[in-house]
Amino acid sequence: MMHSKKLTLGICLVLLIILIVGYVIMTKANGQNAQIKDTFNQTLKLYPTKNLDDFYDKEGFRDQEFKKGDKGTWIVNSGMNIQLKGGALKSREMVLYINRNTRTTKGYFIVGEITKDKKGYTHDKDKKGYTHDKDKKYPVKMEHNKIIPTKPIKDEKLKKEIENFKFFVQYGNFKDFKDYKNGDISYNPNVPSYSAKYQLSNDDYNIQQLRKRYDIPTKKAPELLLKGDGDLKGSSIGSKDLEFTFVQNKRENIYFTDSVEFTPSEDTSYESN
């Protein structure tokens, strides 16, 4: 009888320990997920910034990577990427380098065409396993919230496309991000990197805005993937990107990418060109 009581007590003790450990792990995971979501939310608060000139007066995260007196440079990038039925992956994107020191903005409109390497080699491949065949860059500047090509463009349609280009940060809105539910949130402390994925509906405001501006050849509602790397508390050498993926498979890919980053001015790729 005494042995039976000790056995029962031992089992209860083990179960109690398991419950406590499980609770601690769950609490830690929930806290980390909340921190990741809050980290993304700090960036998403920039959406919308309708007037790009406002970035001249916006302060971003600063650390020891910034030299004394450097006000920093904002890098904004938006692009639509479409590949249909095994054809080339075609992209149209723009990147601007908004220098707060000089209060000048330069960048490129990029028309890209990417095909798979038939032999499967890994040279010059991007993150989705494609090699870049044709990238045409058109230099631009931004003045008074207007995009201006800095070299003559004979194609009038292309010129208008560039001049009328709007970045996602100018019209996107994540005011309800804190209410997003059922996200797949992950964290890799070794890199470190972190991400959050959400299934959206076609009724989502941001999706309606994308469909209004782009001819998206699918009715499928996309997933929103938020990706970041660097210290969760903030890092000027880290990055945060968002991607709306409508279709992704071996033969067909349709996705929109966007990023807004704040970096030391001397580290911007445009300045080094």
Swiss-Prot record:
It holds the Pfam family DUF576. Its main location: membrane. One of its GO terms (cellular component) is plasma membrane. InterPro entries: Csa, Csa_sf. The keyword Transmembrane applies. It comes from the Bacteria. NCBIfam families: SA_tandem_lipo (TIGR01742). This is Uncharacterized protein SAS2374. It comes from Staphylococcus aureus (strain MSSA476).
